[in-house]
Amino acid sequence: MTDQERLAAYDRMYADLLKERDKVLSDMDRLRAAGKNRGVTYQQLLALKLTVQNLIGRFEIYGIKEN
């Protein structure tokens, strides 16, 4: 794998993390609006949100930030 390919892979991974974060937040909002914010699905989404935000934060430590 060349440096260009590696950089492109990191860019794709960062973009995918941002998309996943947005989807998780949307799903959480939908469940919250339905009054299901104490259910197992909501709790699983909350854990996933924290994991994804942690990964995004690690990118930001190295200077890769959302536009």
Q: How would you describe each model-predicted region?
A:
Residues M1-N67:
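Extended, charge-rich alpha-helical interface modules
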